[in-house]
Swiss-Prot record:
Protein name: Argininosuccinate lyase
UniProt pathway annotation: Amino-acid biosynthesis; L-arginine biosynthesis; L-arginine from L-ornithine and carbamoyl phosphate: step 3/3
Transmembrane annotation, as ranges: none
Organism of provenance: Synechococcus sp. (strain CC9605)
Pfam families noted in UniProt: ASL_C2, Lyase_1
PANTHER family linked to this entry: ARGININOSUCCINATE LYASE
Gene3D superfamilies xrefs: Fumarase/aspartase (C-terminal domain), Fumarase/aspartase (Central domain), Fumarase/aspartase (N-terminal domain)
Domain of life: Bacteria
Length: 472
């Protein structure tokens, strides 16, 4: 038809259109600026598709070989920098197809038989995320390993424990660090579980209804390493649950990193003084020469909101979409890519911080647990062990703490006669029981902060990381 659209992606739309896109709309519509990230996955998917087409007789083996060679040529050109898609290509799929046709002529036009960009992009996204999930799992393990090394180093170091950011009870520092190891393990489990749903292949669903071409979906899925194919073609091209699920799991990773970052920020302050930051993981002030700023954990804390935002954006984008594919889905990629990269970078930054970026100030930590009333609960426990009802013991100790505050002293400063005046159950062994190290050691319940229990927890984790025993 005279006046039909030619060239670039628009040329692929057939002669249905008589006018080209407005230049601004062409740029607005294009995703090539960011979906080129999927190039390797797009090439992998196309190679598997070409081989499948030959296996069912839709194209010849010779044509499939040409297509595979052409696609590998595009891969090599991309590696060398000579493959340079432009705005007219619209997206990575058209860019590859255009180059393939330029390399192979009419044979290149056969690659898209039996598929649509709708199932193609869904396949690319899943391949991309599956590969990155495996790498992120290794990054999380690295951070766990850094925390375990610190915990192993501080089996007998104590640290104040807090509730409501008020001194509560003394803890073993290793116990505190192991809490984050446990959180990260749940993160790994969530991501591994999400991977199961990433690993389902939509290729072959075509635009929305399947295809009359006698394709073999199972063969393509197997070659690409998928565990299954989508059972419903509409669902296959409409599903972005896996993007949301990853972003939700990544958001929880960031929650845990942010909580740890917040503690490091506080610990590094002069008010706490629990850690010393190394020069390799801190910055200075442009005005105040005495400053050493905890930029790494501050950035992790700040970037957490960015990942949350991507999750909310994906949910909002998907919630009103009718079946099947809609152009709105173009917005899933930048959110997914950035949520992943931000999470990965924050995990790595925190791993480096705990590997070589901070030292715990043991003397300061051990001093800190001596300067408060965090052993008050142990006075109540002492009375309970001698038959005093807990609530009565609790009320008595509360009154003692108030008296100490009025007199400007600590519980350990009261002599035995003063304790005896309060209750006859107190004996000379009370002062030993109130020592912070004794307080920590007494927490022997399963999962508690008692040194022996922490040794058990730590040994279990170290064996897990040495590959000798699973964590149950």
């Amino acid at each position: 038809m005279a006046g039909g659209v030619t060239g670039g992606a628009a040329g692929t739309w057939s002669d249905r259109f008589e006018q080209g896109l407005h230049p601004f709309i062409e740029a607005f519509n294009a995703s090539i600026g960011f979906d080129l990230t999927l190039l390797q996955e797009d090439l992998d998917g196309s190679i598997a598709h070409a081989r499948m087409l030959a296996s069912v007789g839709v194209i010849t083996e010779a044509e499939a070989e040409q297509l595979v060679e052409g696609l590998e040529t595009v891969r090599a050109e991309a590696a060398s920098g000579s493959f340079q898609p432009g705005l007219a290509d619209e997206d990575v799929h058209f860019a590859v197809e255009r180059r393939l046709i330029a390399l192979l002529g009419p044979v290149g036009k056969k690659l898209h038989t039996g598929r649509s960009r709708n199932d193609q992009v869904g396949t690319d996204l899943r391949l991309w995320l599956r590969r990155r999930l495996d790498g992120l799992d290794q990054d999380l393990q690295r951070l766990q390993g850094a925390l375990l090394t610190q915990a192993d180093r501080h089996r007998r170091t104590m640290i104040p424990g807090y509730t409501h950011l008020q001194r509560a009870q003394p803890l073993c520092l290793a116990h505190h660090l192991l809490a984050y190891v446990e959180m990260l393990e749940r993160d790994r489990e969530r991501l591994q579980d999400a991977r199961k749903r990433v690993n389902i292949c939509p290729l072959g669903a075509a635009a929305l209804a399947g295809t009359p071409v006698p394709i073999d979906r199972q063969r393509t899925a197997k070659e690409l390493g998928f565990s299954a194919v989508y059972a419903n073609s509409l669902d296959a091209v409409s599903d972005r649950d896996f993007c949301v699920e990853f972003s939700a799991a990544a958001s929880l990773v960031m929650v845990h990193l942010s909580r740890l970052a917040e503690e490091v920020i506080a610990w590094a302050s002069e008010e706490f003084g629990f850690v010393r930051l190394s020069d390799r993981c801190a910055t200075g002030s442009s005005l105040m020469p005495q400053k050493k700023n905890p930029d790494v954990p501050e950035l992790v804390r700040g970037k957490t909101g960015r990942v949350f935002g991507h999750l909310q954006g994906l949910l909002t984008m998907i919630k009103g979409l009718p079946l099947a594919y809609n152009k709105d889905f173009q917005e899933d990629k930048e959110a997914l890519f950035d949520a992943f990269r931000t999470t990965r970078d924050c995990v790595e930054a925190m791993a480096i911080l705990f590997e070589e970026g901070l030292d715990f100030r043991v003397e300061r930590l051990n001093e800190a647990v001596e300067q408060d009333f965090s052993n008050a609960t142990d006075v109540a426990d002492y009375l309970v062990s001698r038959g005093v009802p807990f609530r009565e013991a609790y009320q008595l100790v509360g009154a003692v703490v108030r008296r100490c505050l009025e007199q400007g002293c600590l519980l350990r400063d009261l002599d035995l006669s003063a304790w005896k005046e309060l209750h006859p159950a107190f004996e000379a062994d009370l002062h030993d029981a109130l020592a912070p190290r004794a307080v920590v050691a007494a927490r022997r319940s399963e999962g508690g902060t008692g040194f022996e229990r922490v040794d058990e927890q730590l040994q279990r984790w170290l064996q897990r990381f040495n590959g000798t025993q699973p964590v149950g």
